[in-house]
Amino acid sequence: MLRLEEIDLDTIKKELDEERKKVEEIMKGNIPTEIKDLIKMVLFIVESPNKARTIANFFGKPSVRRIGNIKAYETTTGKYILTIVATKGHLFELTLKEEGVYGVLKEKEYVPIFSPIKKCLDCGHQFVDEDKCPRCGSENIDDASDRIKVLRDLAQEADIVLIGTDPDAEGEKIAYDVYSIIRPYNKNIYRAEFHEVTRQAIIKALEEIRDINTNRVKAQLVRRIEDRWIGFALSQRLWSRFKKKTLSAGRVQTPVLGFIIKRYEEYKKNRAHYYAVKTSDFEVTFISDDPLEKYDKTIKIEKIEEKESEKKPLPPYTTDSLLRDAVIELRLSVDKIMALAQNLFEWGLITYHRTDSTHISNLGIQIAQTYIENTFGKEYFYPRHWGEEGTHEAIRPTKPIDTETLIKMLREGDIQIQGITKEHIRLYDLIFRRFIASQMKPFIAIETKFNAVWSNLNTTIEGITDIKENGWNLIKPIKLLAIKEGEYEVIDVKHWIGSKVPLYTQADVIELMKEQNIGRPSTYATIVKKLFERYYVIEKNQRLIPTERGIKVYQYLTERFGHLVDVKLTADLLEKMDRIENGELDYMDVLRSFKKELIEIWKTKETKYIADGIYKWKEYSVPAIVYERYEKILKRKKVYPEYLTPWSRAIYNALPLDNEIEKQTLALAIEKDFEILTKKPILREYKKKYEHLKNLVDQLL
């Protein structure tokens, strides 16, 4: 196997520069056209500017074109002339215009309406449809429409368009959006999928192109529509109940909030007295249900058991296990950790970080072998694939470079990365050590169990007291339990009141989401972040505490819509989305079930909601007072949109009518008068007069 120090970097750089000069000559027309015809002009579209810059530098120093505020990197692989440009994430979001039901039309099938995303450059707020920021009023806006125009212009210059967005359902949706907007300008559009940003992976992706995976796209559409229909509808109920439009609800968000609240209730019920007893050599913590009146001056340690055991390494990181460890060891939020991991991926330092697989490829094993044999010796290398090959690998480094070497290469300019911080380095170190340990042999440990006795209290202490034979502990050192049998003088005692049931950390919540099957690698951090943003929970000493607002919101949602935010239903729903992604389930059937749930939300009795009114029109005859108002408003010659509340406006947009006055009037009548409809007796003499109005309701239903 070729070692890193054996690679002639100068020769490789020279070859790349020669290839680049050759392509420049081709473009100037100085090389025969038969050679020129063999080289394809490729527009390579990725998500982030970081990734675009990293990829461009794999093939020599790129030239840069600036088109508006978009950078396009131009380079060559020898076979392709690449123009690499970034979408900067999603281009479209469901419209907030009053189109259909929350931006989804019902024709033969459900048709979501998307609008280009806009971002305020002053306050960072993201929105659609408005011409200025709805939060701060700024007109300093980054509009995805500008990027769409650039992509279309560049597509016309290319022979082939390759879309290299992230290798998951969300990335596939972005790829589909890009495909849709440039299809009229270039017919040769394909998907390029890679799971690490390395030269080798990019070259492989360019050669193994495929079509868009429409099943992945359908799954992502279902996720988005479900969030808009159910999440938005539940959120609107919260706005009405609590008079605050910053509140939100969702299938996953609400059960997770419930986990935290229930844990907090258990925490309060299991209060106890804690005593940290300190000697000159160690500290032991005891728990008592009642306070102690006096303390012993000594503590006694008795050995219970000692045994030799083989300690195998843990598998390499998945998203949830990385978040769990990084929260504890780096003391960072899950949102921050995912942002750092995204950077490491885009810089080509780690593989894709949204994964639930522990599998390691042959290439990954070779990377581990190179490092382990050079650093510790061949006898410590113990290769493992860690499960069957799937869509993704585990999270691992892309090169046999440890943290010390990485820092050295950054300082000497061998690796050039803009914006890398100590936090990035610490996270990389965590990933690197876990991965290398997973490919090393077990170590042999001496485990010892002790009983500690003090002031009539007992507690068990156990841990590793010695290493008999080294293994993966060389890359992940083990802290030994420094305690021995004997009687020791107590030099200090600290007392506090705590709980036998600890509050959850962010790491615990991620683990619960994984266990209950209500989260995915792409959603773990987002869900936790929302709970903080809505002020449903706060964090104290890394422990999660529900706020009064969070408790009230959860009580309200579970009392009225408990079955819709149930853990089991949420898990079943996510399983259905997985089946859609695998082509095993029709996504339209799932959307139809969502529509039924949406109507169920509307039909709750607390306020004047759309479906209440609609169903009462069907159930009762319309009294004269309603018809008279309807007839009077019909005589107007102008529509007054300001009369429409959010609910009547939603009905107005859903009505399949051409007459604006009729639409507005019926919408107002349904919302304003449904209570009258339930209380007034049937007035049969008016039946013929209001028959037309009933027919309009029938059309809506």
Curated annotation (Swiss-Prot):
Its EC number is 5.6.2.-. Residues 41-197 form the Toprim domain. A zinc finger (RG C-terminal-type) spans 117-143. GO terms for molecular function: DNA binding; DNA topoisomerase type II (double strand cut, ATP-hydrolyzing) activity; reverse gyrase activity; zinc ion binding. It holds the Pfam family Topoisom_bac. Binds 1 zinc ion per subunit. It comes from the Archaea. Its cofactor is Zn(2+); Mg(2+). Zn(2+) binds at C120, C123, C133, C136. Belongs to the type IA topoisomerase family. NCBIfam families: rgy (TIGR01054). This is Reverse gyrase subunit A. It comes from Nanoarchaeum equitans (strain Kin4-M). The gene is rgyA.
